[in-house]
A protein has these predicted regions:
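ATP-dependent carboxylate activation and anion-phosphoryl transfer catalytic cores
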Residues: 80-157
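Flexible, glycine/proline-enriched loop segments at strand-loop-helix junctions
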Residues: 1-4
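Phosphate-binding site of ATP-dependent enzymes
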Residues: 7-89, 115-117
Length: 157
């Protein structure tokens, strides 16, 4: 992943990307607050977790930030209640659109205009003790074993 800050750096970035594989994705950079939101649904309820804010001193939340401790994860996120609710509603809607099952996690950037922008959908989010979902589960006052039991029992009923 390369962040290009000036036009003269575009071609070298593209060349570098092609040296890694046959396809290249070019995206606009969106400056803002990065947040992530977990969600699951059963036949009789919807659970949308508190948001986690992702803060890093790196250019963006990359491999080093994620796996080498160069990130601060703040749950619940330090954003307005209105923005939180908007992200949670959007996460629930994405869950339904995808026909998801079990847990998902959706990542967003909230730029200066306050309108959340979808980054990616994680249909198999990390589940280690330090992953986002377990942090959000704890922030919601729940236990992972209860969440997992809920999801598993729903599939058998």
């Amino acid at each position: 992943v390369t962040k290009v800050k000036e036009a003269s750096a575009i071609q070298p970035a593209i060349d570098k990307a092609f040296s890694e594989g046959r396809e290249v994705v070019i995206e606009s950079f969106i400056d803002g607050t990065e947040v992530t939101c977990g969600c699951y649904k059963t036949a009789d309820k919807e659970v949308v977790f508190p948001l986690t804010e992702v803060v890093t001193d790196n250019e963006f939340f990359d491999f080093d930030a994620k796996y080498n401790g160069q990130v601060q994860e703040i749950t619940p996120a330090r954003i307005s209640a209105e923005q939180t609710e908007k992200v949670q509603r959007e996460t629930s809607r994405i869950y339904d659109i995808l026909g998801a099952k079990g847990l998902i996690r959706v990542d967003y950037i909230i730029p200066a205009d306050g309108e959340p922008k979808l980054l990616e959908v994680n249909t198999t989010p990390g589940m280690t003790a330090t992953s986002f979902i377990p942090q959000q589960v704890r922030a919601a006052g729940l236990e992972m074993k209860d969440v997992m039991t809920d999801i598993i029992e729903n599939e058998f009923n």
